[in-house]
Amino acid sequence: MPRRRVIGQRKILPDPKFKSELLAKFVNILMVDGKKSVAEKIVYTALDTMAEKSGKDHLAVFEEALENVRPAVEVKSRRVGGSTYQVPVEVRPVRRNALAMRWLVEAARKRGEKSMAARLAAEMLDASDNKGTAVKKREDVHRMAEANKAFAHYRW
């Protein structure tokens, strides 16, 4: 534990188009080599495509996709008496969002569509319908936590 005061998290500026902090964070996670304008263009194109296909509001589909990918519990390794246990722990809200966004971007990068915007749009539409690779990742994490429920008393 640090002896000095704990440094708070930096405030992130909302994105220019939709004024959403979540979307700005998503753009930052998608960004490669500091190319923010490219990442913004990809995200906005993907949101337009999603809104067109689903007939819902841009941010509504994005929020729904994130909600369906957010993990509630995860497992952390804990060494006790020479053996390592996978201990299920609840995920903090900030980490929930970060993991959900990271999993969405990873899943989109692995898809087969032509452009990144198309891949991202398809993955987010799948996530909003509770299917797709990102949702499967969340289910796997939850299943792992459920399987190791017996070690929950090792929490710290």
Swiss-Prot record:
| SUPFAM superfamilies in the record | Ribosomal protein S7
Q: Which Gene3D superfamilies match?
A: Ribosomal protein S7 domain
Q: What keywords are annotated for this sequence in UniProt?
A: Ribonucleoprotein, Ribosomal protein, RNA-binding, rRNA-binding, tRNA-binding
Q: What InterPro entries does the record tag this protein with?
A: Ribosomal_uS7 (IPR000235), Ribosomal_uS7_bac/org-type (IPR005717), Ribosomal_uS7_CS (IPR020606), Ribosomal_uS7_dom (IPR023798), Ribosomal_uS7_dom_sf (IPR036823)
Q: Could you give one GO CC term from the UniProt record?
A: small ribosomal subunit
Q: Which GO terms describe its molecular function?
A: rRNA binding; structural constituent of ribosome; tRNA binding
Q: Name the Pfam families for this protein.
A: Ribosomal_S7
Domain of life of the organism in this record?
A: Bacteria
Q: Which GO terms describe its biological process?
A: translation
Write out the similarity annotation.
Belongs to the universal ribosomal protein uS7 family.
Q: What does this protein do?
A: One of the primary rRNA binding proteins, it binds directly to 16S rRNA where it nucleates assembly of the head domain of the 30S subunit. Is located at the subunit interface close to the decoding center, probably blocks exit of the E-site tRNA.
Q: Which PANTHER family match?
A: RIBOSOMAL PROTEIN S7
Query: How is this protein organized at the quaternary level?
Result: Part of the 30S ribosomal subunit. Contacts proteins S9 and S11.
What protein does this entry describe? Small ribosomal subunit protein uS7
What taxonomic lineage is listed for the species of origin?
Answer: Bacteria, Pseudomonadati, Pseudomonadota, Gammaproteobacteria, Vibrionales
Q: What is the name of the gene encoding this protein?
A: rpsG
